[in-house]
Structure formats: structure tokens, C-alpha cells
Regions:
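Long, distal/terminal scaffolding or interaction modules
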Residues: 35-38, 83
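Extracellular beta-strand-rich, repetitive "passenger/adhesive" scaffolds
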Residues: 145, 162-163, 168-171
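Sec-dependent signal peptide cleavage junction
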Residues: 23-36
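Short, low-complexity, Pro/Ser/Thr/Gly-rich segments in the mature regions of secreted, periplasmic
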Residues: 177-187
Length: 187
């Protein structure tokens, strides 16, 4: 049942993104637990808005969609196939286990995917990408990025800027494309 609200809401970008949750339970919308830095929601659709700055946000053991704000965010996806978006600010994103997608956005970000077959997008500015275990894809995009694949057959796309791959190993199936500034093979 939909309720009408006559209250004027003034909110940050993070809060506005979740006003749709008043219309349908989040568990029915995408099958993800939706969590933002500074605002969180459970699978049943309740919304908790916090007025203080949140520096650390943790996901659940299921699939999570975690959205950062325009400030430096630290997010931990935990287990499950998670989507973590840092957006603006110098963010630290940790996917942990599962097939995760990490997106840095603007700012100098540090992105750690963990185990699983992950996809990591650096975004804008100078970023550090660490894939970990699994067959991963690392995209340097803009900025001068440092890309570390780890175990598994990894794909590196250096993108714009002067990107460096620090552990390239073609014997385990690593491949690369685009203009990499430097490719250092694992010894």
C-alpha cells in the first residue's frame, strides 16, 4: 500500500537515491541489500538515515549494492557477489569473497577485490587496484594507476594515463591491452 507524504524532504545525494524504497520493499526491487555510506537499508525495505559522517560501511553476507557519497568512504562488501561504488572522494573499497564489481569513481581510490572472479574500475585520478585470487578484470581508466592482479588469469586494461601492472604473469594466463606505461612480470 502506497502512502502519500506532504513533507518536504531536503537531503543529500545519498539519501535521495533511496526515496524509491518508500514505494516498494528493497528485497523485491533487485534482490540486493542496498547500503549507502551514511544511510543504510535492510532487505525488508526499512531506511535508516544518519546525520553524522560515516567513515566505514559494512555489507552483509549476501549480495550488496553499496554506494559511497561525495566524501572519503571505506566500504567492506563481505561475502556475496557485491557491487561497491565509491563515487567522489578518496575511497577504500574491499570486496572480500564473491564475484564483486568495484568502481572507484572520482578521487585517489584503493580498491581490493579479494577472492572470486572480480571486475575493478579505477575511475578518475590515480588509483591502486588489487584483484586477489580469481580470474579478474582490472580497468585503469583515467589517471596514473597501479594494477595488481594476484592469483588467477587476469585481464588488464590500462586506459588513459600512465598505468603500471606490477605482477603480470603470462604463464598463468594474464593478458593486457591498451597503453600500459610499464608491465612488471612476477618473478
Amino acid at each position: 500500500m502506497l502512502k502519500e507524504f506532504s513533507t518536504r524532504i531536503i537531503a543529500s545525494v545519498c539519501t535521495v537515491m533511496f526515496l524509491f524504497a518508500l514505494l516498494m520493499p528493497l528485497s523485491e526491487s533487485w534482490g540486493y541489500n542496498v547500503i549507502t555510506a551514511g544511510c543504510s537499508s535492510s532487505g525488508g525495505g526499512s531506511i535508516i538515515l544518519r546525520t553524522s559522517t560515516i567513515l566505514r560501511t559494512e555489507g552483509t553476507n549476501g549480495p550488496d549494492l553499496m554506494l559511497g557519497c561525495n566524501t572519503p568512504d571505506t566500504m567492506y562488501g563481505k561475502s556475496g557477489s557485491d557491487v561497491l561504488q565509491g563515487r567522489s572522494g578518496d575511497d577504500m573499497l574491499y570486496g572480500d569473497s564473491g564475484d564483486d564489481s568495484l568502481q572507484g569513481g572520482e578521487g585517489g581510490d584503493e580498491l581490493h577485490a579479494g577472492t572470486g572472479n572480480d571486475i575493478i574500475f579505477a575511475g578518475v585520478d590515480d588509483d591502486f587496484l588489487v584483484a586477489g585470487k580469481g580470474d579478474d578484470e582490472l580497468y585503469g581508466e583515467e589517471g596514473n594507476d597501479l594494477l595488481e592482479g594476484g592469483d588467477g588469469a587476469d585481464y588488464f586494461d590500462c586506459g588513459d594515463g600512465l598505468d603500471v601492472i606490477v605482477d603480470y604473469d603470462p604463464s598463468k594466463g594474464d593478458t593486457h591491452t591498451n597503453n600500459c606505461e610499464d608491465i612488471r612480470e612476477r618473478l
